[in-house]
Design a protein with these regions (language model features):
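N-terminal/domain-start alpha-helical segments
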Residues: 1-122
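Short, well-ordered turn and helix-capping elements at secondary-structure junctions
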Residues: 31, 54, 58, 82, ...
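Pre-signature/interface helix of ABC/ABC-like ATPase nucleotide-binding domains
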Residues: 64, 82, 125, 146-148, ...
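Short coil/turn motifs that cap or connect alpha-helices
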Residues: 94, 135-137, 164
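CheY-like receiver
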Residues: 119-138
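Positively charged, aromatic-enriched patches within helix-turn-helix-type DNA-binding elements
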Residues: 140, 145-204
Length: 204
């Protein structure tokens, strides 16, 4: 699962990035309105954590852009503006949740999991495809009653495909979704093919 953090305060941005990376999310960051607008235009995310008070623009305008582009990312506003009016405005403009600062990182993580469950449509804690069951909260995968031992990237690839049944997935899009910014460092897609080969072997 891929998350974009839009936050201009360096220490908070770094803390959120490290915490969410430990939760096995692919995490990218932007510290300005301009940088965030470029990332949102060029890439897709599962969830965006959006500060609305940015040095070069209002985060609510980014929310507006997402809706105009018919993007389907889940949006959690994180803001020091905690009045009822601010919360209502953010939610009415399309945010999925509104978390006032300061907040506990455990609560942030719980809210991310909650909006991602809602994004899947049924709000369930597991994803079932035939005899394959994925439990995103614990990163566990079962075929029938047998639990599979998957590496992190193998799990990420499987989860990406499982959330897009009957879709043709471009290898560049898959690499960017699973490896994030680091996908640009590769000259070819051998690393993607290698992980997929291992995954197919384990699923067989």
């Amino acid at each position: 699962m891929k998350i974009l953090i839009v936050e201009d305060e360096p220490s908070l941005r770094e803390l959120m990035q490290k915490t969410l990376a430990k939760e096995r999310y692919v995490v990218e960051t932007a510290d300005t309105f301009y940088e965030a607008s470029l990332k949102i235009a060029d890439y897709s995310y599962d969830c965006i954590l959006l500060d609305i008070m940015l040095p070069d623009g209002n985060g609510l305008k980014l929310l507006e852009m997402l809706k105009e582009q018919q993007k389907r990312e889940s949006i959690i506003i994180i803001s020091a503006r905690d009045s009822i009016e601010d919360k209502v405005l953010g939610l009415e403009q399309g945010a999925d949740d509104y978390l006032p600062k300061p907040f506990h990182l455990a609560e942030l993580n719980a809210r991310i999991k909650s909006v991602l469950r809602r994004q899947r449509g049924d709000g369930s804690r597991s994803l079932q495809l035939g005899n394959l069951r994925i439990e995103p909260d614990s990163f566990r995968v079962f075929v029938g009653d047998k639990e599979l031992e998957l590496l992190k990237k193998e799990y990420d690839i499987l989860f990406y495909f499982a959330n897009r049944p009957n879709h043709i997935i471009d290898k560049a899009v898959l690499a960017e979704a699973v490896w994030g910014d680091h996908a640009d460092d590769a000259d070819n897609f051998h690393f993607v093919y290698a992980q997929m080969k291992n995954l197919r072997r384990k699923l067989a």
